[in-house]
A protein has these predicted regions:
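C-terminal His-loop and adjacent cap/lid subdomain of alpha/beta-hydrolase
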Residues: 1-444
Length: 444
């Protein structure tokens, strides 16, 4: 699978482009095109290695792999385990309120069974079974998590949380859920009661480096956090993306409980707004299959890039990108009859359980995820939150002294302070980093 290694993907793209230039001559411009994992690759390559791709056409967008793994990991272990195992059983409506999903099957049948990219057993068929890692039978075997596959980026360390004691160092992991109050906004909107909120967070637990459930919350490696942000493995709105033309065509799948949730497009847009003050180089189009804008968007991207190339002014590159955008490129959606509705794409953070503001949101309402319901930002890129003391003012429902004491025992070090950037979180301003063996522009 390549382990979602976007650095390898960037190098591969660069080599293909080089081969094309040697065979046919220099390309006029290079346009990224693809969905889901292909969207991740485009955004990560354009952000961390600007110039390989001149413009990008992502579909079924995820901003990057690592922040997307927050949703898959938390559904797969803490939430799915608790929500399915509770007695008496919980209704699907209650489960959806805790996760923010359009339907419980988003977690149960779509996110939950996804390939375990952060676990050691996500190996391609080319690696023989007897060569693969097992904590008891083959502790020195090949580990296939994204972080083990990117050891030259994330580095390694000894982990003593696995039994028996490992005989090899493992790739550093930035995944974390310390201080996360699952279901907080569901509690504050009256969708769950205090007893369930406390029970959920008391029993959610976390996972170890082998992605096995444990009672303790998952704790990120501090160096892995720093590396994830500084190197652009978590996509920010800065770096190369600040000057990249982006047309995001979103095939709406929320209604069929597909993990390609439409809110990820709004996540990417919000990162651009946060880091650049705007997202004017980003166009969001929403529609339902079988309608497709692929041919039209390719032609519009070509027109956009030609106009940028013809701009001989001394303006900053970001201003040229915005100024050259074709007039026909606007946020829009298309109804079942193929009629275009032009209006700004809006995600109302205050209406995550009923995001139907505007005609396009009425047709294609974006939903959320468990971290959003836990109070996290729409940028959805806080891997590990800063902590703060428990504050009764954060809860719309008054807590009794017994409930407060119980909450303090669940979160002895405090709860997430979502008003602050994540631990180690910085914009990605260093591009074209390398990871050895060449010393040129090597990340340290």
């Amino acid at each position: 699978q390549g382990g979602c290694n976007d650095v390898l993907s960037a190098e591969t793209t660069m080599m293909v482009k080089e081969r094309f230039a040697e065979t046919y001559g220099p390309p006029v411009h290079t346009i990224g095109w693809g969905g889901s994992g292909g969207a991740m690759q485009q955004l990560l390559i354009a952000g961390a290695y600007p110039g390989i791709l001149d413009g990008i056409l992502p579909t079924l967008t995820f901003p990057d792999a690592i922040s997307y793994f927050i949703d898959t990991a938390e559904c797969r272990l803490p939430l799915r385990r608790f929500l399915n195992g509770r007695n008496p059983p919980l209704s699907d409506d209650v489960k959806n309120a805790i996760g923010g999903w359009a339907d419980w099957d988003v977690c149960e049948r779509s996110l939950g069974p996804r390939p375990n990219r952060i676990g050691p057993d996500d190996c391609p068929a080319s690696i023989p079974l007897d060569a693969r890692y097992h904590p008891v039978d083959n502790p020195g075997g090949v580990r296939c998590s994204i972080y083990d596959g990117m050891r030259n980026v994330f580095g390694t360390r000894a982990y003593d949380e696995v039994e028996p004691t490992p005989v090899q160092p493992f790739g550093r992991s930035p995944q974390d859920n310390v201080g996360v109050q699952y279901g907080l906004e569901a509690l504050n909107r009256g969708l769950i009661d205090t007893g369930l909120f406390l029970e959920l967070n008391e029993q959610a637990g976390g996972w170890d480096i082998d992605f096995q459930w444990r009672r303790e919350r998952a704790a990120a490696d501090p160096d892995a956090l720093r590396i994830a942000y500084e190197t652009g493995r978590v996509t920010s709105g800065s770096g190369g993306l600040a000057t990249t033309p982006i047309i995001d065509e979103r095939n709406y799948l929320d209604h069929v409980a597909n993990f390609h949730a439409s809110y990820y497009s709004f996540v990417m847009r919000e990162r651009l707004v946060r880091d650049n003050g705007h997202a004017d180089n980003y166009v969001l189009q929403r529609r339902m299959a079988p309608l497709s804008r692929a041919d039209e968007n390719l032609a519009l991207m070509d027109e956009w890039l030609v106009a940028i190339a013809l701009d001989a002014t001394a303006d900053h590159a970001a201003a040229k990108v915005v100024g050259a955008k074709p007039a026909a490129l606007r946020d829009a959606c298309w109804n079942d009859d193929g009629i275009e509705i032009v209006e700004p794409a809006v995600f109302d953070r205050g209406a995550i359980f009923n995001n139907t503001q505007g005609r396009c949101n009425e047709l294609f309402p974006p939903h959320a995820g468990a971290r959003i319901v836990a109070g996290g930002p729409l940028t959805s890129d806080v891997l590990k939150c800063e902590l703060k003391p428990i504050d009764p003012a954060d809860y719309a429902v008054p807590l009794t002294s017994e409930e407060t004491t119980r909450l303090e025992s669940i979160f002895p070090d405090g709860v997430c302070d979502w008003s602050k950037p994540g631990v180690g979180q910085v914009p990605n301003t260093r591009t074209w980093l390398s990871y050895g063996p060449s010393p040129v522009n090597r990340y340290q």
